[in-house]
Amino acid sequence: MSRLIFEARRRLAPPSSHQGTIIIEAPPELPRVIPPSLLRRALPYLIGILIVGMIVALVATGMRVISPQTLFFPFVLLLAATALYRGNDKKMRTEEVDAERADYLRYLSVVRDNIRAQAAEQRASALWSHPDPTALASVPGSRRQWERDPHDPDFLVLRAGRHTVPLATTLRVNDTADEIDLEPVSHSALRSLLDTQRSIGDVPTGIDLTKVSPITVLGERAQVRAVLRAWIAQAVTWHDPTVLGVALAARDLEGRDWNWLKWLPHVDIPGRLDALGPARNLSTDPDELIALLGPVLADRPAFTGQPTDALRHLLIVVDDPDYDLGASPLAVGRAGVTVVHCSASAPHREQYSDPEKPILRVAHGAIERWQTGGWQPYIDAADQFSADEAAHLARRLSRWDSNPTHAGLRSAATRGASFTTLLGIEDASRLDVPALWAPRRRDEELRVPIGVTGTGEPLMFDLKDEAEGGMGPHGLMIGMTGSGKSQTLMSILLSLLTTHSAERLIVIYADFKGEAGADSFRDFPQVVAVISNMAEKKSLADRFADTLRGEVARREMLLREAGRKVQGSAFNSVLEYENAIAAGHSLPPIPTLFVVADEFTLMLADHPEYAELFDYVARKGRSFRIHILFASQTLDVGKIKDIDKNTAYRIGLKVASPSVSRQIIGVEDAYHIESGKEHKGVGFLVPAPGATPIRFRSTYVDGIYEPPQTAKAVVVQSVPEPKLFTAAAVEPDPGTVIADTDEQEPADPPRKLIATIGEQLARYGPRAPQLWLPPLDETIPLSAALARAGVGPRQWRWPLGEIDRPFEMRRDPLVFDARSSAGNMVIHGGPKSGKSTALQTFILSAASLHSPHEVSFYCLDYGGGQLRALQDLAHVGSVASALEPERIRRTFGELEQLLLSRQQREVFRDRGANGSTPDDGFGEVFLVIDNLYGFGRDNTDQFNTRNPLLARVTELVNVGLAYGIHVIITTPSWLEVPLAMRDGLGLRLELRLHDARDSNVRVVGALRRPADAVPHDQPGRGLTMAAEHFLFAAPELDAQTNPVAAINARYPGMAAPPVRLLPTNLAPHAVGELYRGPDQLVIGQREEDLAPVILDLAANPLLMVFGDARSGKTTLLRHIIRTVREHSTADRVAFTVLDRRLHLVDEPLFPDNEYTANIDRIIPAMLGLANLIEARRPPAGMSAAELSRWTFAGHTHYLIIDDVDQVPDSPAMTGPYIGQRPWTPLIGLLAQAGDLGLRVIVTGRATGSAHLLMTSPLLRRFNDLQATTLMLAGNPADSGKIRGERFARLPAGRAILLTDSDSPTYVQLINPLVDAAAVSGETQQKGSQS
């Protein structure tokens, strides 16, 4: 049986029905009467009696003539009595009550008329959606046939009869204080009005099949069938077979009651045939019907009571009272399935009533519903449909079938606006791209349909400039949330992209908020970029602005150069350029650039400076074929400035206020567009300023695309014979063959229409030019950066990352040039901004292109310890942390010695162009300081708030660059960089800062700091001083790709010179000759340059040594005694040793030398020594010439006092030297000790030494004379300071040497007890140090 395709059209609008609120004024209130007290009631009468009494008294006394003055007092009393009687009486008069009641009743009559008008509208709307069943026969073939779809509110709502329903309009009475005070008649009238008008009787009422799963119907068989026929008739009249299927199981299937169902297309089984055509979901056995429906029911989810727009709804009727539905598969609720069971089993009286599984009973022309405990009215007058009426309706519908190419589960309104239909595409999954992209006439270019108008005609969107007959170049679209703005934008873009190649059109989609719809176009070949989520990634907004400026400049330059080449002067527009191409000149095409700026008002709120950008591009773009569509949810005239003045066409979707609608389209119609998803995409287009708005609905392109299906089976019969068309399946005759075609093609996974088209377009033609490079969001491996930079080895240049230059539409390597003025570098960044990682990249990149003899690195790690990962790299000479102060000092010592060495060699200044330098083993040297803030706060105290080594860093920055010594530092704050150092740091790179206000990067005229655009979640991302974004390459230091071992393997046997440290135990032979001349002894090795430390006792004959126990004091004395004795004779040197603890008792002295450990011997020994030295003074009476030539005769005397703090400085209490102090004879000789041959060496404990220098006469004199001082190990908290230096916890033998110079020096003292086989270096201590 052949059928005609029914083409559904736009649904006719039903009569309007308001669902607002009618507010009713409350009835008038009567004043509450409060009875007065007895006294108040009696007082007027008492006053009246008093007045009469006064008058009688006046008359009785003979006052015949009463003056007015006499009557004044009675008159006042009369007024008071009247006031007391009437003053507080709140009781309303009867006339007043009657008047207020009449006014209110007249008001209620007006309200009643309004309510009745609302009720009439509601009834008319209900009758339109649910007409009487007798009127259904006139619907087939009309515009109303199959008008409902899943987006309509009455979809799958079947009329069941007429019932009393609540009024859709809410009736609300204004609040009153208390109903007791209301006027009774008015109150009663109001109550009567509300009780009567809140419901409407005899209104068509329906059953929503989406909210129920099984429906059980009881009652007399004929009435039940009549009711079900009415339900089915309503369902098949209003719903397309693609959205609703009907199935029936009845014993008397071929009877008059159900035989008519065979004519309906809704019962057909897709893809199955019998002898007469499509098979039908009709059966006499419910189980057989379930088998037919098995494939359809198998994959359906459980019933939820919610609409299922993506599933075809099934209405299954089981007319078999004896069938146990609860034991069948149909008892399981499934989404999109409603089962109606005609049953004869009444519910148990305690059976629970389930709203999703109603039990209905048809009785006496009405329908009742089972509620817990009994039957309740459900439908007052049930609809019934006779078998003849049903057969007539079914035959009228039998001639129609739904359109096999339409998806079915879409709005009837959008079916008429199908994207493929408007573009003439039969199958979007098999596009003829060459035909779609075929060259067009200019008047047809950029002109595409994007929807349908209110009359059903295609709405053409013409992007061309108005001078070329279009609507452009620029437009404005406004639509609130839910209005279909994204749907309309996608429709415009998909139409343009489907019909134009990248040689004619390219697109930039900029979405400030980051909607998902924008990403759908990312893979189209014409799409230059999809820029989304600019609200969170502010750098994207800056790149977008730079890209637009750059494209305008690029096109302007292209027109200028091409015009000069062709005609001698620049082309004024792309139109002239294309005319030159048409004239035969070989020029590359310039495609139209279509820019969609979605949510541009939000962009302007965060970036107000972009208003000028859009204005500039809009003005310049008119000639350069750059078209912009501005889209947003609202229109803020104060923010958009002159943008709206540059737009030609306007699109207004649903907006939030009439004023916005007037601003967009000139009238308020956009505000009055109805809300709801069924009205998404409805709007008005104003093609030109002042034109009449055109109402339209855009096509829906964001849904799943289902390609059209073709029949896979045909019926072949050799001898045609008539067959009886029955409801049940008709078996074919032996001569009939139902032949299947080829095997079913495997079904592709569901895909959206945009993705389906985009995948095909990507395989054709050229892609859009790369105007937009992706932002620096992806990590750049160091290996990739090295490959892209193309820098060769031994050029003293290496890449650090990439610089983003969106204006020029390219990325350039970020290259460090060691031989340039930017040879010193500072990296400024906040916490976790990637500073330490950047240093790793810097070192590894240099090491990848140079040998350890060409570049070497010395690192001070005050950061997170990340530089420690590079300590095994051959190019790294040392990595020192904050816990290694000695290594830090030695690093500076090595670099300063290198600087001094190169300064002394003038040839270093004459390095050749090839970088050749005198070979000192270092090459280009880099001092790398990670975290200058931490470095500057190290080695400080309350008097020295900055690290003294900062001055040495500043010296290297300002002087070292000319001698191949570079400084690379990182700092969290630019303020931490000393002023004297800043000018020497030629390269400044700024990473993300904690506060953008600390940034040093500025752009003249910009309203925002460029640092605001640096992402917070991307370490290594930053700005150059030119405000260009860059990204450091990642050093790739993971376990699998660690480059350290690979780089070291390329340079076997080569390494940067290490930082040499002082040995922890210094053997005498390690410093060479110990005795460098009279009174010149080598006592150790200096940390600064590892040179020997010479103690010149002739220049400064006084030496103080302080240190805690086992720090090396006595060991130094032992070394001095041995060295002097071994290189002197008894006639030249003599010793006086005061050793309280007998540590030096085994040291051999010269004969007759004084050694004592007895405190009683100290005073006579000092007296004898003082007399001896005093005798060396020149005698009196010598001339000046004699004095200048005079020298003392005798030996040099060494006074060695070990542990001077152990010798009491108090006067002797007994003996021959009573009252004398031990050091008094000596103190007077100390100032001339050098001239008189006296050398005094004292040692003492570190603890309390600062106090002793102020209290002990001997030590105070030493300090006054600036004696050479050695500060060995001591507790910094207990020992105080000596000449501004604090003791430190040092290894044994390590000391701070204080001389008359400004700076202290760390030294390692010689240990004479070290075994001769011990070598100089970081060896374990051999021999004791005390």
From Swiss-Prot:
Subcellular locations according to the entry: Cell inner membrane
Pfam family of the protein (one): FtsK_SpoIIIE
GO function terms (MF aspect): ATP binding; ATP hydrolysis activity; DNA binding
Annotated residues for binding of ATP: 479-486, 829-836, 1107-1114
Keywords annotated in UniProt: ATP-binding, Cell inner membrane, Cell membrane, Membrane, Nucleotide-binding, Repeat, Transmembrane, Transmembrane helix, Transport
Residue intervals of the FtsK domain: 456-662, 811-1000, 1090-1280
GO CC, alphabetical: peptidoglycan-based cell wall; plasma membrane
InterPro entries tied to this protein: AAA+_ATPase (IPR003593), EccCa-like_Actinobacteria (IPR023836), EccCb-like_Actinobacteria (IPR023837), FtsK/SpoIIIE/SftA (IPR050206), FtsK_dom (IPR002543), P-loop_NTPase (IPR027417)
Any further remark recorded for this protein: Was identified as a high-confidence drug target.
PANTHER family membership: SPORULATION PROTEIN RELATED (PTHR22683), TYPE VII SECRETION SYSTEM PROTEIN ESSC (PTHR22683:SF1)
Protein name: ESX-3 secretion system protein EccC3
Species, as recorded: Mycobacterium tuberculosis (strain ATCC 25618 / H37Rv)
Lineage per the UniProt record: Bacteria, Bacillati, Actinomycetota, Actinomycetes, Mycobacteriales
